[in-house]
């Protein structure tokens, strides 16, 4: 039995008070949620403190909340911020736990079967278990997730029903407890004690929950009764205290009891017979043989071990679902009355829509060629309409909400005023004739004031030619193209901020992490060429790159003013007017954001002999590269321990680059 706490309150801890537009945005959002409104949009300009507003809303409505971001990096940033705002509540992190993932696939044209290959990040797996167990144990939970949250997960009912509940005084034999732990996929290992394992010493059983990384539990027996339960330091065995109740959650999310397993196996066998008959009728004897061999092996593993690699492909039978019925996901672990917040919704909702189709086409190939049963098609992400059916109340958060969000609700709450008093930049349009020389003059003016410039082009060739020309003119310039790896991109941004160079040229400057307060000029070339990066939303987002500097200015080079340009210019001018009026009324002088320049790169390129020396990895010999990989692994673990997953991911990418040279 799980002790589910329902009366905890969210407690927001912050040295800030709501300011600017934040108080009215918070009040409106909270009133609408408490009034039962299903969907609303928080349209917050860049740098207006949207995450703080979200935190205030969560603390006031006091509902379990799912925050979805469109990639792991942003989810990690949000997770860190919410952990700071809610240190006394359960802030959890749920993203894909794969460091590396090659999905199972088949390419008919070359008759190539690609087996599933993956590397699981143990730390993230722990955090996923922490998220699901927290949702079943308490009400004050915020889960920050990527779109992984719409992928199939085991049944929450089976997961909860499988919990092993222990108390001092409970009559249960030691052997019965050991069997119960094995049933929920715990592994006995008396030597290597890790998450998801237990060890036995006489009448003492030590259990290391899947959701922990440092603390384990020592269950002491007296005969066939639990005498006491202690929380201990897993590494040293030091006793931390006694507990009066312990709920051990399964070591995997795909878990089922013996009765359900027998039913599931019978259904898998029946489906196998059906599919074999179909293949034989069509003369597909190779496919039939392939399917029979693989499925019978999986059935044997399920019968003997209760688990097999790829068990998720049989989840429909395990869960007792009908064909085509949506899978259980993280959303099913939440209670009925919960809140969803979609960060950067103009990007995230598009991802949620697209996940199903990509997964379906790959799996159909596996089914058609006898690598999987048709029921594998039901191990999938949710369709968008299935996601919508889980929505009780939702807030879309974006500076530029998409068409989908605007179709869902007419309730749009604006947050335009920045706590720093910074204004949206001035935008002007200049003709393309003589644009490069004109831009050169603007760049030189910024260089004299120790300010930086972003230039965005539409083609790779234009970006390269422009970079070469400016270099010839004596400008310190770099070109950031799509092939640049994560770590190198971080290094480029850091060098730009430090003044190693003054101008950054790129095609897409909307990626996360490219917010540079030192940038006072954004130049948009070919602004009148309609497309993804030159539509209204793309232009507004690009203009926002100059909104962190009090001298922010945007120049669009174009021969005509398109509707997208005009709407972006009008919207920026509207916001700027509101911001100026607010500043004037309250006597606020805009101040450029002061943002610490974190030295990520020196961390990853440190060499043992000279701490601050940076090296070119290509110049290292094999032994030096091996030593560097060891150092990087240690630094990656240190970053993980302080929950800085963004840094950890960047160090990991650096490690992969070093390993690739061997």
From Swiss-Prot:
<keyword id="KW-0227">DNA damage</keyword>
<keyword id="KW-0267">Excision nuclease</keyword>
<protein>
    <recommendedName>
        <fullName>UvrABC system protein B</fullName>
    </recommendedName>
</protein>
<dbReference type="Pfam" id="PF17757">
    <property type="entry name" value="UvrB_inter"/>
</dbReference>
<dbReference type="GO" id="GO:0016887">
    <property type="term" value="F:ATP hydrolysis activity"/>
</dbReference>
<dbReference type="InterPro" id="IPR001943">
    <property type="entry name" value="UVR_dom"/>
</dbReference>
<feature type="domain" description="UVR">
    <location>
        <begin position="626"/>
        <end position="661"/>
    </location>
</feature>
<dbReference type="GO" id="GO:0009432">
    <property type="term" value="P:SOS response"/>
</dbReference>
<keyword id="KW-0347">Helicase</keyword>
<dbReference type="InterPro" id="IPR027417">
    <property type="entry name" value="P-loop_NTPase"/>
</dbReference>
<dbReference type="GO" id="GO:0003677">
    <property type="term" value="F:DNA binding"/>
</dbReference>
<comment type="similarity">
    <text>Belongs to the UvrB family.</text>
</comment>
<feature type="domain" description="Helicase ATP-binding">
    <location>
        <begin position="31"/>
        <end position="188"/>
    </location>
</feature>
<dbReference type="InterPro" id="IPR024759">
    <property type="entry name" value="UvrB_YAD/RRR_dom"/>
</dbReference>
<keyword id="KW-0067">ATP-binding</keyword>
<keyword id="KW-0963">Cytoplasm</keyword>
<dbReference type="InterPro" id="IPR004807">
    <property type="entry name" value="UvrB"/>
</dbReference>
<dbReference type="InterPro" id="IPR036876">
    <property type="entry name" value="UVR_dom_sf"/>
</dbReference>
<dbReference type="GO" id="GO:0006289">
    <property type="term" value="P:nucleotide-excision repair"/>
</dbReference>
<dbReference type="InterPro" id="IPR006935">
    <property type="entry name" value="Helicase/UvrB_N"/>
</dbReference>
<feature type="short sequence motif" description="Beta-hairpin">
    <location>
        <begin position="97"/>
        <end position="120"/>
    </location>
</feature>
<feature type="domain" description="Helicase C-terminal">
    <location>
        <begin position="435"/>
        <end position="601"/>
    </location>
</feature>
<dbReference type="Pfam" id="PF04851">
    <property type="entry name" value="ResIII"/>
</dbReference>
<dbReference type="InterPro" id="IPR014001">
    <property type="entry name" value="Helicase_ATP-bd"/>
</dbReference>
<dbReference type="InterPro" id="IPR041471">
    <property type="entry name" value="UvrB_inter"/>
</dbReference>
<dbReference type="Pfam" id="PF00271">
    <property type="entry name" value="Helicase_C"/>
</dbReference>
<dbReference type="Pfam" id="PF02151">
    <property type="entry name" value="UVR"/>
</dbReference>
<dbReference type="GO" id="GO:0005524">
    <property type="term" value="F:ATP binding"/>
</dbReference>
<dbReference type="GO" id="GO:0005737">
    <property type="term" value="C:cytoplasm"/>
</dbReference>
<keyword id="KW-0378">Hydrolase</keyword>
<dbReference type="InterPro" id="IPR001650">
    <property type="entry name" value="Helicase_C-like"/>
</dbReference>
<feature type="binding site">
    <location>
        <begin position="44"/>
        <end position="51"/>
    </location>
    <ligand>
        <name>ATP</name>
    </ligand>
</feature>
<keyword id="KW-0234">DNA repair</keyword>
<keyword id="KW-0742">SOS response</keyword>
<dbReference type="GO" id="GO:0004386">
    <property type="term" value="F:helicase activity"/>
</dbReference>
<dbReference type="GO" id="GO:0009380">
    <property type="term" value="C:excinuclease repair complex"/>
</dbReference>
<dbReference type="GO" id="GO:0009381">
    <property type="term" value="F:excinuclease ABC activity"/>
</dbReference>
<keyword id="KW-0228">DNA excision</keyword>
<comment type="function">
    <text>The UvrABC repair system catalyzes the recognition and processing of DNA lesions. A damage recognition complex composed of 2 UvrA and 2 UvrB subunits scans DNA for abnormalities. Upon binding of the UvrA(2)B(2) complex to a putative damaged site, the DNA wraps around one UvrB monomer. DNA wrap is dependent on ATP binding by UvrB and probably causes local melting of the DNA helix, facilitating insertion of UvrB beta-hairpin between the DNA strands. Then UvrB probes one DNA strand for the presence of a lesion.</text>
</comment>
<comment type="subunit">
    <text>Forms a heterotetramer with UvrA during the search for lesions. Interacts with UvrC in an incision complex.</text>
</comment>
<dbReference type="Pfam" id="PF12344">
    <property type="entry name" value="UvrB"/>
</dbReference>
<keyword id="KW-0547">Nucleotide-binding</keyword>
């Amino acid at each position: 039995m799980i002790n589910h706490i329902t009366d905890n309150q969210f407690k927001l801890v912050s040295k800030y008070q709501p300011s600017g537009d934040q108080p009215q945005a918070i009040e409106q959002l909270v009133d609408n949620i408490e009034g039962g409104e299903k969907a609303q949009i928080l349209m917050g300009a860049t740098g207006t403190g949207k995450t703080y507003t979200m935190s205030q809303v969560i603390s006031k409505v006091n509902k379990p909340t799912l925050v979805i971001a469109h990639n792991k990096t942003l989810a990690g940033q949000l997770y860190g911020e919410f952990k700071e705002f809610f240190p006394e509540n359960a802030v959890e992190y749920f993203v894909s736990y794969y460091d590396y993932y090659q999905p199972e696939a088949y390419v008919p044209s070359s008759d190539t079967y690609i087996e599933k290959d993956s590397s699981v990040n143990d730390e993230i797996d722990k955090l996923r278990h922490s998220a699901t167990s927290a949702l079943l144990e308490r009400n004050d939970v915020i889960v920050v997730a990527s779109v992984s949250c719409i992928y199939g997960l085991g049944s929450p009912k089976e997961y909860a029903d499988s919990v092993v509940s222990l108390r001092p005084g409970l009559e249960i034999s030691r052997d019965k407890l050991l069997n119960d732990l094995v049933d929920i996929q715990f592994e006995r290992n008396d030597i290597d004690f890790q998450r998801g394992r237990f060890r036995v010493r006489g009448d003492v059983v030590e259990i290391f929950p899947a959701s922990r990384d440092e603390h384990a539990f020592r269950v002491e027996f007296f005969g066939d009764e639990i005498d006491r339960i202690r929380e201990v330091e897993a590494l040293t065995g030091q006793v931390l205290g006694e507990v009066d109740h312990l709920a051990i959650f399964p070591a995997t999310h795909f878990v089922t009891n013996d009765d359900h397993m027998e039913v599931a196996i019978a259904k898998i066998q029946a489906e196998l017979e059906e599919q074999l008959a179909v293949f034989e009728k069509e003369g597909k004897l190779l496919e039939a043989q392939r399917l029979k061999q693989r499925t019978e092996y999986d059935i044997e593993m399920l019968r003997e071990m209760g688990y097999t690699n790829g068990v998720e492909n049989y989840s429909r039978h395990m869960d007792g679902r009908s064909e085509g019925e949506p899978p259980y996901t993280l959303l099913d672990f939440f209670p009925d009355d919960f809140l969803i917040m979609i960060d950067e919704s103009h990007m995230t909702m598009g991802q949620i829509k697209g996940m199903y189709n990509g997964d379906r086409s790959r799996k159909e190939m596996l089914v058609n060629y006898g690598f999987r049963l048709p029921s594998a098609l039901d191990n999938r992400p949710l369709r968008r309409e299935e996601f919508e059916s889980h929505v009780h109340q939702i807030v879309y958060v974006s500076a530029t909400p998409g068409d989908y969000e605007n179709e869902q609700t007419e309730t749009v709450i604006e947050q335009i005023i920045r706590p720093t008093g910074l204004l949206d930049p001035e935008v002007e349009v200049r003709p393309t004739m003589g644009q490069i020389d004109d831009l050169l003059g603007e760049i030189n003016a910024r260089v004299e004031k120790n300010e930086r410039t972003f230039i965005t082009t539409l083609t790779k060739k234009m970006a390269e030619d422009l970079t070469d020309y400016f270099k010839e003119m004596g400008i310190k310039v770099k070109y950031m193209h799509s092939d640049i790896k994560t770590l190198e991109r971080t290094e480029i941004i850091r060098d730009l901020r430090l003044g190693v160079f003054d101008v950054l040229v790129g095609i897409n400057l909307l990626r996360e992490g490219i917010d540079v307060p030192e940038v006072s000029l954004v130049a948009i070339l070919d602004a009148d060429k309609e497309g993804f990066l030159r539509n209204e939303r793309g232009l507004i987002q690009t203009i926002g790159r100059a909104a962190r500097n009090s001298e922010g200015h945007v120049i669009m080079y174009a021969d005509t003013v398109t509707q997208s340009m005009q709407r972006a210019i009008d919207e920026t001018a509207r916001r700027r007017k509101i911001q100026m009026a607010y500043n004037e009324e309250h006597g606020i002088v805009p101040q450029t954001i002061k943002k610490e320049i974190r030295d990520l790169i020196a961390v990853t390129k440190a060499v043992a002999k000279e701490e601050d020396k940076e090296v070119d990895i290509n110049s290292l010999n094999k032994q030096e590269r091996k030593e560097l990989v060891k150092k990087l692994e240690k630094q990656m673990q240190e970053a993980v321990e302080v929950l800085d997953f963004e840094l950890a991911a960047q160090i990991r990418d650096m490690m992969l680059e070093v390993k690739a040279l061997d």
